[in-house]
Amino acid sequence: MAVRIKLKPGREKSLERRHPWVFSNGIHNVKGKLEAGDTVDVVAHDGHWLGRGAWSPESQIQVRIWTFDREEEIDREFFKRRILRAQAGRDDLIREQGLTGYRLIAAESDGLPGITIDKYANVLVCQLLSMGADVWRDTIVDVLAELYPDCAIYERSDVDSRKKEGLASTMGLLHGTLPEMPVIIEENGIKIAVDVTKGHKTGFYLDQRDNRAMAARFVKGKSVLNCFCYTGTFGLYAAKAGAASIENVDVSALALDTARLNMRVNGLNDDNVHYNEADVFKLLRQYRDEGKTFDVIVLDPPKFADNKSQLNGACRGYKDINMIALQLLNPGGVLLTFSCSGLMPADLFQKIVADAALDAKREIQFIERLSQASDHPIGSAFPEGFYLKGLVARVW
């Protein structure tokens, strides 16, 4: 008999709606002997079968569901089917946008909880963030090596969230030969340098691809301030679209060096591009005090809230930085502002920016609501997959 976890009365509703998480406070009892990462069946209090997932005793999320199909076994073929399905769902996008860099597996939203896989040219980068994912590492690598024989496989599980699973951070080569860094990927006809060993996340922010392309609509002949620019790709799109001037701002000198490289690999002259190694919060206040203005400002800050207790502080931070940015925009200018925190509801983020406009004494119109690129899908039963929120505002 399979090891079985029984839920408390009434705690089956989320699984019946196919949400893939079982929290520790919803478990009534465990029947059978379990080790971390083991596959376990989950049943309702009345005994009816709900799903099959991975056991993670040290996490608040103690089971992540692999499948809601009682006949589906969790084995090598299971992972192969999931990866093939995810690839098929991205093939049209890859052809349309000429992508050599994209998210192959978006964790729960692709039916593989705790597993993120990004493809950068001939390198696959994995993040294994749950106990179940960690236990199946060798199988996942074996399947990837079969399906993508020309790719090196590199792990970037160097994230704090693994601690919640009782796992140590880890990174390194899992298969093949890693090419010299950076690798060059392409999107929408633009080349981008990515260092998968040192870059943020798995190396780059693939989720902003569509927003980079959209932002280019507003920049021809305009002055652009690109805040928290990382490797400068919003500025790169702006340069190609004919911006009059671009200022890329980031606290990392290494990121700015890559921003310069990105201009070179695209054959673009950067005489009108300024690279500013600075704290964005301090710089915006300095520019406001100096009376400096811009036509377009991009605000793409790091995550302000990792848990619910930090949300109020995040709201204050978003309001403050958006207020100052609005004060720096010329009449008719455009603000592109983002939140990458999954805890920040889209409607609340819009209200924060609206309140910032009141404090800045500026009139704004919201002309676009933005999200993550379509290779970062949002499972219908997993609203937590909707993490990137963006707004485009015309400012008067």
Swiss-Prot record:
Read off the InterPro entries from this record.
Answer: PUA (IPR002478), PUA-like_sf (IPR015947), PUA_sf (IPR036974), RLMI (IPR023542), RlmI-like_PUA (IPR041532), SAM-dep_methyl-trfase (IPR019614), SAM-dependent_MTases_sf (IPR029063)
The protein's enzyme class: transferase
A Pfam family the protein falls into: Methyltrans_SAM
The family database entries (CDD domains) matched by this protein are listed as: AdoMet_MTases, PUA_RlmI, RlmI_M_like
* UniProt keyword Nucleotidyltransferase, yes or no: no
Q: Which UniProt keywords apply?
A: Cytoplasm, Methyltransferase, RNA-binding, rRNA processing, S-adenosyl-L-methionine, Transferase
**Which subcellular locations apply to this protein?**
Cytoplasm
Q: Which reaction does it catalyse?
A: cytidine(1962) in 23S rRNA + S-adenosyl-L-methionine = 5-methylcytidine(1962) in 23S rRNA + S-adenosyl-L-homocysteine + H(+)
Q: What is its EC number?
A: 2.1.1.191
Q: Which domain of life is it from?
A: Bacteria
- One example GO MF annotation: RNA binding
Question: Cellular component terms, GO, for this chain's entry?
Answer: cytoplasm
Q: Where is the PUA domain?
A: 2-79
Q: Which family does it belong to?
A: Belongs to the methyltransferase superfamily. RlmI family.
Q: Report the function annotation for this chain.
A: Specifically methylates the cytosine at position 1962 (m5C1962) of 23S rRNA.
Q: What is this protein called?
A: Ribosomal RNA large subunit methyltransferase I
